[in-house]
């Protein structure tokens, strides 16, 4: 009855079955027994976000950094962590986290951040630098390196924040999502046209439908859970 791992695993199983409310109860029980059980907090946060309980969900999601199996470690930048304070006249460093798909998903938050800060620097996966720079020309993008680019260690930068943590300040409720439903990524026009012509020539008069995404870094189980059948 006091085995926290069992309650956490029960929560995972219930979530897989679509029993989200019961999963929440299981995670709460695990946390009741061990209040610093990071995995249960993180799992609870993801379900709360899924159900639209955004404020509490984002708060629980912050436990991800303390999870034993969280694949991407924190970046140790010297600037203070941004806590949602006024950014007028301030600069902020945003560092991307997790996989390339997560970086693209969380980039949706950058448009909202632009509205409250005029000086934003983003550290991201090198393959996304040109893509993001084209999509957000007002923001400076720097490829992720180890150790970090020395420019990002500058004490003149006022704050730093992981990109996934922007949600608790910029997406606190359903209205904040509804107000930011516009597209935010810009493709390369020339390359898009080249690809379009190539497949049109191959398809002749047939209808073209193309959707392709493969997560090479994910485990097979995770990949299957993110995929759909044809």
Residue ranges and their predicted role:
Residues 1-230:
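Alpha-helical solenoid repeat scaffolds of the TPR/TPR-like class and their adjacent stem/linker regions
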């Amino acid at each position: 009855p006091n085995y926290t791992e069992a309650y956490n695993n029960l929560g995972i199983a219930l979530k897989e079955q679509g029993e989200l409310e019961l999963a929440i109860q299981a995670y709460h029980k695990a946390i009741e027994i061990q209040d610093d059980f990071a995995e249960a907090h993180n799992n609870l946060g993801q379900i709360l976000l899924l159900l639209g309980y955004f404020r509490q969900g984002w708060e629980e999601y912050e436990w991800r950094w303390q999870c034993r199996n969280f694949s991407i470690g924190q970046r140790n930048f010297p600037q203070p962590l941004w806590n949602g304070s006024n950014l007028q006249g301030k600069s902020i460093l945003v560092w991307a986290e997790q996989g390339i798909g997560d970086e693209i998903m969380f980039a949706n938050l950058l448009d909202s951040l632009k509205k409250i800060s005029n000086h934003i620097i983003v550290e991201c996966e090198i393959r996304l630098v040109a893509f993001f720079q084209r999509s957000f020309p007002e923001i400076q993008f720097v490829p992720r390196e180890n150790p970090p680019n020395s420019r990002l260690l500058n004490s003149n930068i006022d704050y730093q924040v992981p990109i996934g943590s922007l949600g608790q300040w910029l997406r606190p409720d359903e209205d904040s999502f509804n107000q930011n439903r516009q597209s935010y990524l810009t493709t390369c026009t020339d390359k898009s046209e080249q690809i379009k012509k190539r497949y049109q020539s191959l398809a002749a008069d047939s209808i073209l439908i193309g959707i392709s995404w493969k997560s090479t870094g994910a485990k097979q189980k995770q990949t299957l859970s993110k995929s759909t059948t044809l």
